Amino acid sequence: MNATSAVRCRRAGFNPPLLILALALTGCLQPQQRAEEFSAASWPARREALQSLDHWSLQSRIALSTDEEGWSGTLTWRQDENYVDARFSGPLGVGGFRIEGVPERLELETSEGEHFVFTDPEAELAAELGWRVPLASMRYWMLGVADPQSGDAEETLDEHGRLEELEQRDWTVRYTSYRSFDGDTLPRKLVMENDDLRIRLAVDDWELGGPRL
């Protein structure tokens, strides 16, 4: 069931926090139209198109922080429908991991050889650390659109009719930069945050409609 969105237009050993980052990355980013084609009137159609796209890959820098600590590194992400293959490398290759699978069953392997299987990732993470990360929603938030399965959302569009800020499930997502990648205008920088976590992405490259995994 699609979310009902209120749109405003405006001018102008294995470290548990790495587990948070790995699980939080089960979202996706997707293409948008050229900036000159954007408008508030075209947003509903573009929202639906973005929510339906599911074959892509990206390379990005990523940083995660809590009130006490922070982590950063690089991310290589491949999405094939509901199947994800994401690889994180920390500074100098330290603290890396790979996560792959579908939302109902995710496997995580660290650079130290540790292996984890999650059959209910969001609930298991909440039980482990007391922080509930909206994993399924992040797939859509990173793409630049509200999660169609997660109820009402409040969207703010920028002067070009692109998503600038999103509020959903007690999270705020801010899109601070867009850029053209091979003719498609995509989120370049975004921040996802709630009272417990802050996740920043700076995307360096996209490939759309690539070979399936």
PLM features: residue spans?
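Gly/Pro-enriched, hydrophobic low-complexity segments
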Residues: 144-213
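N-terminal secretory signal peptides that target proteins for export/translocation
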Residues: 1-11
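Extended lipid/amphipathic-ligand handling interfaces
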Residues: 75-78, 99-101, 176-180
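C-terminal motif of bacterial Sec signal peptides marking the signal peptidase cleavage site
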Residues: 25-27
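An acidic-aromatic
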Residues: 83-132
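Bacterial signal peptide processing site
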Residues: 29-32
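A short, Trp-centered hydrophobic/proline-enriched beta-strand micro-motif
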Residues: 46-68
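Short, low-complexity intrinsically disordered segments enriched in A/P/G/S/L with frequent Arg
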Residues: 16-17
